[in-house]
C-alpha cells in the first residue's frame, strides 16, 4: 500500500448514519448522530450525560492546515502520515491527566479508534483561550514594532525574543466572527481584552460573569499540568490555545469543560529544552512547518497578510510541497506523541476501512 493510501485525507464521506449535514472542518469532520442512536449509545455504553444529550462522531484527518490553508505534497500526498492519530493520542493523554488532577472534563465520551472520538454536543464559549509562557510569534512581532499593550495587558520594557515572560499571560481572541459587540471588530481571530469579555460575557456564550474567572483558572491549571509533564521529557511548553464549552451531566447540571484538542503540536508551541538551553529553537510542533513555508515561498507576506488571502489560497492549491517537508513533519508528530504518551503511534494500513469496521461492529452506526 502506498504512502498516500495510509493518509486519511478525506474524512467527511464515511457511511455513518446521520440525519444532518456532515460538518467538515479544516482537519476534523463531525457526524451528528440521530436522536435514536444517541439515546441508544448513552444507554448501552453508560455515558455520564443526560439521557437525551445529542452525540456526534468526530473523525480527525491527516490533512495539514497552516495559515488557514490546506497543503499537499508531491506524489499526491494530501496529508501527513500519522498526524491525525498522533494529535488524538496526545489530546487523550492530556485529558486523562487533567481528570487525574481534578480539573474539568472534556467533551470526549469514547474513543472507538485512534482517528475517532464520540463526543457530546457542547455550547462553545466563543473565545480562543490562548496562554503564553514565552514571548515569541505574533506577540514578539507586535512588541518589536513598539506595541506595549497586548489584549489589554501592559507589557514591560526590556523583553527579549523567545525569552520567558515575567508571568503566564492569557491573551484571548475571538472564535469566529462575532457581531454587535462594542469594541470588538467583526472579524475572525481578533485579540480581545478581559474587559471586552466582562462587559459582554453573554455575547461570548458565558452563562454567568463568574465563569470568566473559572475558565481562566482551568486554562492556567491545564497549562501548568502540561508544562510540568513536558518538562519531565525535556520539552518546553511555550504557548497554547484551549477551547471551552458547556454541557449537562447525567443529572442535568451544567458544567464548563475543555473542548477540541489540547496541548498538541497543532495548538501549541513546544520547544526542545536542551537545545533551548544552548540558545537554539528546535520546534516540536507545527510551528516548524509554518517556518518552512515562510522560507520556501519567495514572498512570505502572502502567508502573513490577511488582505492577500486569495493569493495564499492559490499558493496552496497550485503547489505540491517537497515530500521530505511533509515526512519531516510526520516524524515531528510521531516523535513528540511517543515522548508524551510513552507509546509509539502505529500507522494504519487503511484507516478509513478500520473506522467503518469498528463503528459497524461495536457501535451499530453503519448500515
Swiss-Prot record:
HAMAP family per the UniProt record, alphabetical: SAICAR_synth (MF_00137)
InterPro entries documented for this protein: SAICAR_synt/ADE2_N, SAICAR_synthase_Vibrio-typ
Molecular functions (GO terms): ATP binding; phosphoribosylaminoimidazolesuccinocarboxamide synthase activity
The UniProt record lists the keyword Ligase: yes
Family: Belongs to the SAICAR synthetase family.
Top-rank lineage group of the source organism: Bacteria
GO biological process: 'de novo' IMP biosynthetic process
Protein EC: 6.3.2.6
Name of protein: Phosphoribosylaminoimidazole-succinocarboxamide synthase
Encoding gene (name): purC
Any single Pfam family the record assigns to this protein: SAICAR_synt
Xref: SUPFAM superfamilies: SAICAR synthase-like (SSF56104)
Disulfide bridge map: none
Keyword Cell cycle: no
Enzyme kind, highest EC tier: ligase
